[in-house]
Structure formats: structure tokens, C-alpha cells
Amino acid sequence: MFKALIVALAAVAAAIPTQQPSSNEMNCDSGVYCCNKVAQNTGIVVPIDALSSTCGDTLKLVTVDALNDKCTSQTVCCNNVQQNGLVNVACTPIDV
């Protein structure tokens, strides 16, 4: 009886959905940047531990304000940034 109860509780716990944050809910502690060019990480030039994208060519810090600064290009969140000239490595595209 006790074994059946444990198995039932484990099945219920495994079936409970967990909510994954959408891209709009993602926290970006290191800063949001506006990139004119965003390239996918190919693993050849970019270090293996980098995230999904690199951001290069004209970076500026984006302030999310409805009236003033807006990014007309791709906004990205950069974590564990490795900067080499004008290219930031470890940037993930986000929707603002």
C-alpha cells in the first residue's frame, strides 16, 4: 500500500506542468543591447561556452521606454560577455 502511494505521488508530481518564462519575461541582468547585425554561433570562431548568438556592429544600451529610445534592429541580452573589438559574444535575441 505504501509503495503504491509513493508511486502515485511521484506520477502526480511528474505530471504537474511548470511554466517556462517567455522571451518577454526573461530577466536580463547584464544589459540589453541593440545590434545592427546578429550572427548565429557557428562554434568555429566563437568559443564553445558562448550562448546562441554574437552581436556586432554598432552597439548601444537599450532603455525600454515607450517615448524615447527604441531599437529598430535586433535587441539581445548578453550574459558572460566576451568582447573582442566591436563583437559581443554570448548574446541571446529577445523581444522588447
UniProtKB/Swiss-Prot annotation:
Q: Name one GO molecular function term.
A: structural constituent of cell wall
A matching Pfam family: Hydrophobin
Induction record:
Expression is induced during nutrient deprivation and during formation of infection structures.
UniProtKB keywords: Cell wall, Cell wall biogenesis/degradation, Disulfide bond, Secreted, Signal, Stress response
Q: Which GO terms describe its cellular component?
A: extracellular region; fungal-type cell wall
Task: Work out whether the entry's keyword set contains Cell membrane.
Answer: no
Which SMART domains does this one have? HYDRO (SM00075)
Q: Show the InterPro entries listed in the entry.
A: Hydrophobin, Hydrophobin_CS
| Signal sequence coordinates | 1-19
Here the disulfide bonds are: 28-77, 34-71, 35-55, 78-91
Q: Where in the cell is it found?
A: Secreted; Secreted, Cell wall
Which coarse location class describes where this protein primarily resides? secreted
Instruction: Keyword check for Signal, yes or no.
Output: yes
The organism's superkingdom is given as Eukaryota
GO terms for biological process? cell wall organization
Oligomeric state and interaction partners are given as:
Self-assembles to form functional amyloid fibrils called rodlets. Self-assembly into fibrillar rodlets occurs spontaneously at hydrophobic:hydrophilic interfaces and the rodlets further associate laterally to form amphipathic monolayers.
Tell me, in a sentence or two, what this protein's role is. Answer: Aerial growth, conidiation, and dispersal of filamentous fungi in the environment rely upon a capability of their secreting small amphipathic proteins called hydrophobins (HPBs) with low sequence identity. Class I can self-assemble into an outermost layer of rodlet bundles on aerial cell surfaces, conferring cellular hydrophobicity that supports fungal growth, development and dispersal; whereas Class II form highly ordered films at water-air interfaces through intermolecular interactions but contribute nothing to the rodlet structure.
The record's similarity note reads: Belongs to the fungal hydrophobin family.
What is the protein name stated in its UniProt record?
Class I hydrophobin ssgA
